[in-house]
Amino acid sequence: MRILKIIPQAFYTSRGTPLSAYHRAKELEARGHEVDILTYGVGEEAPDLKARVFRSIGPHFKRSIPAGPSRLKIWFDCLLFMNLLLRLCLRRYDLLYAHEEGALLAKLAGAIFRIPYVYDMHSSLPLQITDWKFSKRRSVISVFRWVERQSVRGACAVVAISPAVERAARSVCPTARCVVIVNHFETSNDVSADEAANLRMKYGIGPQHKLVLYTGSFVALQALDLLLESVPRVLARVPEAVFLLVGGSDPEIAELRAQAERLGVASSVLFEQMQPQRAIPAYLAAADVLVSPRVKGINPPGKLLPYLASGKPVVATDTLVHNQILTERCAILTPPHAAGFAEGVVAALTDPERVAKTLAEATQVVASYCSPTARDAAYADVIAAASAAGRNRNVAAAAPNGA
């Protein structure tokens, strides 16, 4: 099948929706489909991807775009839609595969060119407006609720990245054809002991230290302030603990470093800029504990399954963003506050019996979401829905009144 993926993001970057979209493209390619990508005019070159990447042309005004909703993003989406129409004039596709609000663009363009679309739903659009503090105005939230409703109802299939996202789609349209495909970022876990030791040495972390690692974006939604507030409590009981946070920009790191200094823990907290995805397995191998302090949202962090597959204990807040994937059997779940999170980290560092039990179950959770058989079946369901929708549109077009 010839597929045009619509990615309303700075593609490529090694986190969030762009990273999810990248791996979706690779999985579609691996299943024999021809994939083109249409995205914003900003972003990096994607590694090891067969797909052709077409970037929006037009006045973008900025060379980068922040994560989350913004007025600039709305303008970028307008440019993306004009470029989508142009692309569809130049080439025929069997399916439009759209991420996030790109589904509305796909619905409009698909109606003109008689092409079905799949909505890859990463979260609830109106919920993002409030979680990212873009606007509190009811009129603005209502507009995004309408966009989500139109996107779900018109899609031949909705690919939800988690069970909670699937529930959000069905709340909009109970009859929607939904398939849950949890983000699974394929990386090699074949990291030698020497590589892990060298990475620890790079940051001055000796064998006597216990390394607590966070990887991912540093946006406020990730609740890294909560993580830092937990550090003094952890150090009071495990003074050899060291925290390494990987994935920030210089301004983000400066802000969090200032918080660490105010808390008096700057000497025990290290920061690193965003790293390429291929480098992350070495960080996971070097760590003693992996953490995810996020509280808000319904879209699980993409790091969860790589965390579980790493063979290291995982500590996360016991909130919907995590507990739709994680349970107390495969991870250490904590109340969503600093004191509770600190207790979880301390348990991961000092309770080997509990850790052993979670690691055994983590392997089963990864297998349930990431087995080739399960993912093949999920993608086959999506493609079957797209094929059926394409046939129906062709029949309608061939009917006497179909034109």
Language-model regions, residue ranges each:
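Membrane-proximal helix-turn-helix segments that form the acceptor-binding/catalytic region
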Residues: 23, 82-89, 104, 108-112, ...
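A short helix/loop element that forms part of the nucleotide-sugar donor recognition site in Leloir-type
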Residues: 48, 191-205
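Nucleotide-sugar donor phosphate/pyrophosphate-binding loop at the beta->alpha transition
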Residues: 74-79, 116, 127-151, 195
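Acidic donor-binding loop of glycosyltransferase active sites
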Residues: 156, 282-299, 312
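Carbohydrate-associated surface elements
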Residues: 164, 184
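Nucleotide-activated donor-binding/catalytic signature segment of Leloir-type glycosyltransferases, i.e.
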Residues: 254-278
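Conserved acidic donor-binding segment of nucleotide-sugar-dependent glycosyltransferases
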Residues: 328-339, 347-353
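A charged, aromatic-enriched C-terminal amphipathic alpha-helix characteristic of glycosyltransferases
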Residues: 353-384
